[in-house]
Amino acid sequence: MTAQQPPRLLRGIPLAVRNLQKTFGSRQVLRGIDLHIPAGQFVAVVGRSGCGKSTLLRLLAGLDQPTGGDLLAGSAPLTDARDDTRLMFQEARLLPWKKIIDNVGLGLKGNWRAQALQALDAVGLADRANEWPAALSGGQKQRVALARALIHQPRLLLLDEPLGALDALTRIEMQQLIERLWQQHGFTVLLVTHDVSEAVAIADRVILIEDGEVGLDLPVELPRPRVRGSHRLAALETEVLNRVLSLPGEPPAPEPVSPLPTQLRWAQ
């Protein structure tokens, strides 16, 4: 057993990213990204604002189309795995006119309520099932969004800074919850985050994107559960931060977003 593969069922999707490129007009945002992500691995993607990390996640989610390169789930196109993929954003995106359990079961047909309650129980909110979203805190709303993803039994979970707006304590609690559920279910995770300490605390591997390219690919070979504030975690965090801070600090342009309609399967 290694730090990268805790004892759990590995049912995640293996990903291959080959020479991935994305251009918006005259601006090249991604410049030949190459990655291999084994099934069930937890990968954190960090980098300065505008470096291309959110664009990478959007391409994996099918929200934008690459200009060049390949996205594969195993040996098949990643588009074949869309039903097994879920995306969580920084905002929970709950429908305020639907009760919590109905938000979890959004879009489902048949007898889904028992599954929705089970998903809410997994995130500690089964007792709030019949309340309205307005009654929840920000962290609780993100738990509901996570339950909405879990009910579909995803094999690939994409997280676009879902904890960015939470207070420090709630953020740590959500990190621990996501880590526990990942260990239980074995899905592949890609987390985009600005928080390097978060990345090294919960990921198997930290990818640093620099100006649209992979600048650092760092394995986090530490046993779980990890001790926050430990010397070894601090050393890894410093290694990543030193690389980020060694780059020129010019104000970046925001990453473009394609205006074209897409087939979005967010945490729904």
From Swiss-Prot:
InterPro entries: AAA+_ATPase, ABC_transporter-like_ATP-bd, ABC_transporter-like_CS, ABC_transporter_ATP-bind, P-loop_NTPase
Record-listed ATP binding positions: G47, R48, S49, G50, C51, G52, K53, S54
GO molecular function, one term: ATP binding
Enzyme class: translocase
Entry's localization field: Cell inner membrane
A UniProt-annotated Pfam family: ABC_tran
Keywords (A to Z) from UniProt: ATP-binding, Cell inner membrane, Cell membrane, Membrane, Nucleotide-binding, Translocase, Transport
Source organism, top-level taxon: Bacteria
Catalytic reaction annotation: ATP + H2O + aliphatic sulfonate-[sulfonate-binding protein]Side 1 = ADP + phosphate + aliphatic sulfonateSide 2 + [sulfonate-binding protein]Side 1
Cellular component terms per the entry's GO annotation: plasma membrane
Topological relation to the membrane, as annotated: Peripheral membrane protein
Domain (ABC transporter) ranges: 15-236
Enzyme Commission code: 7.6.2.14
Function statement: Part of the ABC transporter complex SsuABC involved in aliphatic sulfonates import. Responsible for energy coupling to the transport system.
The protein's assembly and partners: The complex is composed of two ATP-binding proteins (SsuB), two transmembrane proteins (SsuC) and a solute-binding protein (SsuA).
Family named by the database record: Belongs to the ABC transporter superfamily. Aliphatic sulfonates importer (TC 3.A.1.17.2) family.
Name of this protein: Aliphatic sulfonates import ATP-binding protein SsuB
Originating gene: ssuB
